[in-house]
Design a protein with these regions (language model features):
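Short catalytic/ligand-binding loop motif for oxyanion handling, primarily in non-cytosolic enzymes
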Residues: 76-78
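Beta-barrel outer-membrane channel/assembly domains of diderm bacteria
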Residues: 1-74, 89-128, 137-150, 157-161, ...
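A small/polar (G/S/T-enriched), proline-flanked helix-loop surface module common
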Residues: 85-86
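Alpha-helix capping and helix-loop boundary segments enriched in small/acidic/polar residues
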Residues: 132-133
């Protein structure tokens, strides 16, 4: 099993960026996506031919605003999640911001504003390439506020995801990190969600995470524990299913 990806970018003014992602791989199942442990490593699959995976254009508007427009791009591309952890698995690297940071791809547009002194705010939209913002389409909207104090940070993210009908799922994620002078960082995240249209006994979701990482020798050592994605309520209670990892990279 293998996956290959190359990211190309260029600038027309020195302040903008045109980004194109090309990938290939043979790791997909017959259903078209990876399952099991391999899915955690974001291995491209589906075609061994080189394909265009995403195209986006990012540009400034004035001195403090940045705008992005893209295809097969996340609506949260300009969001800031206060998390210093970045391990090998996709799930724990989300830092419990599983659904609020909308990542459903498709056509996307977003904007971020830098207020200065570490405070930023951003909004984003993502939906299918056809039927954008219609009653029949499954659209996603999100907003994010973050503060970065240099060695610590906080962020609050809200996401609203529509299904093909009239129901709407909403999620709110809170993230924080702190970096010590020794180079060790601690990150934590917590997300709650409400499944629109679901019965009262199964309409809540929860995700949480805590991770530690820092420089050790020539590389980085880290470990984390958290829920296996977003856990949905069952029978009036949210089940506890955890995953953990430890890594060393150099």
């Amino acid at each position: 099993v293998y996956g290959f990806q190359i990211d190309l970018n260029t600038s027309f003014t020195g302040e903008d960026s045109l980004d194109i992602s090309l990938d290939a791989g043979n790791g997909a199942t017959a259903a078209g996506s990876l399952t099991g442990p391999l899915a955690e490593f974001d291995i491209n699959g589906g075609s061994e031919a080189l394909t265009v995976d995403g195209v986006s254009y990012t540009f400034p508007v004035g001195d403090s605003m940045t705008v992005i427009v893209g295809d097969n791009t996340d609506g949260s591309a300009l969001f800031t999640t206060a998390c210093a952890y970045g391990g090998p698995s996709d799930t724990l690297s989300d830092c419990a911001n599983v659904n609020a940071g909308i990542t459903n791809g498709g056509f996307a547009v977003g904007a971020a504003y830098d207020f200065g002194n570490g405070l930023t705010a951003a909004v984003g939209y993502a939906g299918p390439e056809t039927g954008i913002m219609t009653e029949e389409s499954a659209d996603a909207y999100g907003a994010n506020v973050a503060f970065d104090g240099g060695n610590y940070g906080l962020s609050l993210t809200y996401g609203s995801l529509e299904d093909a009908g009239t129901d709407e799922d909403t999620y709110t994620a809170l993230n924080a990190y702190y970096s010590f002078d020794s180079g060790i960082s601690i990150s934590a995240g917590y997300e709650v969600g409400d499944i629109g249209g679901a019965l009262a006994a199964v309409d809540e979701t929860e995700a949480y995470f805590i991770g530690v990482n820092g420089e050790v020798g020539p590389g980085e050592l880290g470990a984390a524990i958290g829920t296996v994605g977003s856990m949905q309520e069952a029978g009036g209670a949210i089940p506890e299913r955890l995953m953990y990892e430890a890594y060393y990279s150099y």
